[in-house]
């Protein structure tokens, strides 16, 4: 699927400075009238589970080998990126199943609180400990019934559907929608969106129009009267801070039919029926996940972490997809190699491949695999990251465009475009990196 990342906090980065910067002892006691800085507790950033710290650095971004077919010069650019945390492996079926199960169980608990299914209000929290009303949300401390009554059983049954032909009873994946909200800090910080017109420019030669109408674009999603999901991009005059809060409703179940639809005239029914559902594939990378689903997973993962850390935690850097520059910087390793490994060959001295890809025309098994492989069976790169080439391609947050690296900044570069529902398909394309098990060497 992809790897998530967490940005290193600025303070944690400052704590690691050494070498050319030397060391400086903080003053214990300041003299009267002197600026000595505020005191504070030392901070050590804990390592997020399953993630590797990638220190800040420089890379030449872009293809090292020029286009051999057309002889066109491929752009390269020197860029610098700040430090961040990155998952050491691709997201597995097991990890993504946890997300799907969370969505399923939240829907079930909400339904058990519905009068149509017994109306047990203890499955929802509607007020705080002081008795003040809050936005209704699921009470996860309330266990699901082990011996459901008739109404509760109907709630359970409502999440499943039966194939009228085969009689198979399966989860109704169409119901597995996850709703989340993301505050756009970047848009909110832009001067052109300041609520006070006087703050929109520092140029005193510019005459401020206090009646200027500033338009803002935001995403929203809701259920209509028929229970259908409606997704819209709204353009309206800026009115307040809520204009920077975007709402999404995303169906989270992966497209298991990709095994059939992406491979014409191939016998892949086994993977269609088993790859995501069978525990034997738990440690394999999840596939069939859209860019929207990948972002929803990151949002859920952030929310899940916050709930696990408890109410004393006010803020953490949220999980997100890496930018294309961050991904490439991490994949190249500490020595910024052409490949995630240390040489230009695809096999080691013993003839073993460094990654899971398509070694030869029609020959998928030459590297020991037919389809995807379990994560982390190949050696990691020098950053401690597995499968940065091959196995499955990975989503980034960066827009795919022909301008590519030339259009990016040389400082924490990326290209972002929040495509509206009605935008043409070409504006919705995102960059994927790393190649996959079905791609030739040139794609990795």
Pin down the residues of each PLM region.
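Positively charged n-region of N-terminal signal peptides that target proteins for export
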Residues: 1-4
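Sec-dependent N-terminal signal peptides
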Residues: 7-14
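C-terminal motif of bacterial Sec signal peptides marking the signal peptidase cleavage site
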Residues: 17-19
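Functional-site microenvironments in short loops/helix caps that host divalent-cation chemistry
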Residues: 24-31, 53-54, 60, 65, ...
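N-terminal pre-domain segments of enzymes
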Residues: 24-44
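A short glycine-rich, aromatic-capped structural motif
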Residues: 43-119, 132-133, 137-140, 144-278, ...
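Charge-dense polyanion-binding interfaces
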Residues: 116-126, 347-351
């Amino acid at each position: 699927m992809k790897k998530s990342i967490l940005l290193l906090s600025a303070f944690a980065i400052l704590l690691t400075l050494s070498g050319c910067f030397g060391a400086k002892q903080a003053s214990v006691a300041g003299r009267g009238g002197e600026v000595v800085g505020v005191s504070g507790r030392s901070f050590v950033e804990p390592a997020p589970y399953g993630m590797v710290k990638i220190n800040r650095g420089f890379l030449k971004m872009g293809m090292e080998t020029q286009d051999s077919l057309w002889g066109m010069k491929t752009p390269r650019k020197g860029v610098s990126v700040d430090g961040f945390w990155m998952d050491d492996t691709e997201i597995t079926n097991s990890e993504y199943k946890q997300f799907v199960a969370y969505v399923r169980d939240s829907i079930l608990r909400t339904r058990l609180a519905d009068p149509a299914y017994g109306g047990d209000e203890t499955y929802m929290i509607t007020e705080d400990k002081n008795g003040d009303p809050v936005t209704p949300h699921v009470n996860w401390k309330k266990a699901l019934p082990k011996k459901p009554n008739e109404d509760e059983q109907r709630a359970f049954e409502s999440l499943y559907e039966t194939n009228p032909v085969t009689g198979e009873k399966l989860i109704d994946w169409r119901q597995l929608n996850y709703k989340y909200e993301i505050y756009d800090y970047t848009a909110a910080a832009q001067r052109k969106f300041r609520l006070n017109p006087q703050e929109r420019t520092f140029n005193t030669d510019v005459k401020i129009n206090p009646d200027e109408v500033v338009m803002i674009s935001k995403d929203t999603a809701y259920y209509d009267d028929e229970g259908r999901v409606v997704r819209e991009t709204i353009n309206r005059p800026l009115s307040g801070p809520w204009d920077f809060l975007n709402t999404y409703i995303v169906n989270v179940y992966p497209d298991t039919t990709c095994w059939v639809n992406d491979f014409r005239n191939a016998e892949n029914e086994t993977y269609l029926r088993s790859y995501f559902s069978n525990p034997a594939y738990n440690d394999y990378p999840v596939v069939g996940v859209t860019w929207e689903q990948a972002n929803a997973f990151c949002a859920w993962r952030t929310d899940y972490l916050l709930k696990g850390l408890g109410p004393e935690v006010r803020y953490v850097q949220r999980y997100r997809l890496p930018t294309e520059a961050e991904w490439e910087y991490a994949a190249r390793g500490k020595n910024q190699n052409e490949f995630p490994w240390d040489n230009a060959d695809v096999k080691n001295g013993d003839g073993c491949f460094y990654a899971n890809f398509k070694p030869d025309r029609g020959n998928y098994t030459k590297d020991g695999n037919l389809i995807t492989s379990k994560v982390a069976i190949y050696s990691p790169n020098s950053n401690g990251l597995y499968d940065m080439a091959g196995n499955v391609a990975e989503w980034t947050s960066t827009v795919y465009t022909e301008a590519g690296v030339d259009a990016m900044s040389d400082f924490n570069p990326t290209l972002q475009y929040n495509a509206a529902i009605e935008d043409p398909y070409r504006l919705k394309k995102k960059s994927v990196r790393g190649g996959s098990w079905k791609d030739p060497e040139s794609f990795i």
